Amino acid sequence: MKKLFFVTNVDWFFISHRLPIALNAIQQGYEVYLLSRDTGRKQFLQGKGIRFIDIPFDRSGSNPLHELKCIFQLYTNYKKYRPNIIHHVTLKAALLGSVAAKLSGQHHVVNAISGLGYNFTNGRNGILQKLIRTLIRIAFKSKSFSFILQNPDDVGMIKGFNLVPSSHIFLIKGSGVDLNEFVFSQAPGKTQLKVLFPARILLDKGVMEFIDAAKLLQKRFIGKVKFILAGDCDKENLAVLGEEKLRSLLVDDYIEWIGYQAQMFPIYTDSDIVVLPSYREGLPKSLIEACAVGRPIVTTDVPGCRECVKSGYNGYLVPAKDSRALADAIGLLIEDDAKRKEFGRNS
């Protein structure tokens, strides 16, 4: 039986972004493995027929010795099982996994990078960026590896490294959503509108800009609008806004945090406007879901986000890190019921 390896930093990301593909591969006769860090989903995945190999990825990536340990564990498993296809998902898994694949003589490798990341491309932290670029040149240079990127900016950047043939670089816009689950629905039409931030509570997702924009609009709309944050405080992410700090910024019956939601469809259907002021993305699943459900969107004019919105057609694009522009765009949609419905239909 052919073996297909999925390799990603953490099991919950695999469930949200790759599980349907894995289940389809099983139906086609593949023996599917997930090599990832177990955060409590191992038994669930094994129940789906997926073989689980625990690799202790550290998402903060601050210990080089730990990264070498992960490479060695990947190498050992690649040598032991000799998979027919290795599918690395996320930048870190692709970097470490590609080194392990080269060392073990594996050639059928697909690196799916959902976003190169704001910290890698923002022009700051030059030493870290130089290190990552060096690692990319070492890990990814191969005539046999293939790459899947989610937006044209990332495609251009990977092509600029000149590491693999251009014919091995593919643009697939996003990880997709199940349209049987995320179906178009009319906005709730309640007296109190809801503005939704559907993302982890991270600074580079624009969480502070969302909260700042809400507070700029507070005098005009308190009692008429509620701003909802639906996402986890990802404590392992260096860009996390801590839970204590977040709670200090909430406003009763105006800015509310509902935490991680396993089922997002009812959250979208109960919302009127979706907002993601991120600094950079691959192509955010949350915005694809919002489009599928038929919600107007306010997001930033940055790689990944701009691919989901045609400004003035299904939402508005605003500059990153601009709370005032964000507030103005949200305010336009709050005040214009007809525009919200039009943009929602166009999504």
Describe each region flagged by the PLM.
Residues 231, 240-259:
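Nucleotide-activated donor-binding/catalytic signature segment of Leloir-type glycosyltransferases, i.e.
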Residues 36-40, 198, 226-241:
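Glycosyltransferase donor-sugar binding loop
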Residues 311-312, 316-323, 332-338:
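Conserved acidic donor-binding segment of nucleotide-sugar-dependent glycosyltransferases
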Residues 260, 279:
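Aromatic "clamp/platform" in nucleotide-sugar-dependent glycosyltransferases that forms part
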Residues 21-28, 72-75, 129-148:
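Membrane-proximal helix-turn-helix segments that form the acceptor-binding/catalytic region
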Residues 53, 133-184, 197:
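Donor nucleotide-sugar binding/catalytic pocket of nucleotide-sugar-dependent glycosyltransferases
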Residues 296-299, 309:
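Short hydrophobic beta-strand element within catalytic cores of glycosyltransferases
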Residues 186-205, 210-215, 227-228:
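Conserved donor-binding/catalytic core segment of Leloir-type glycosyltransferases
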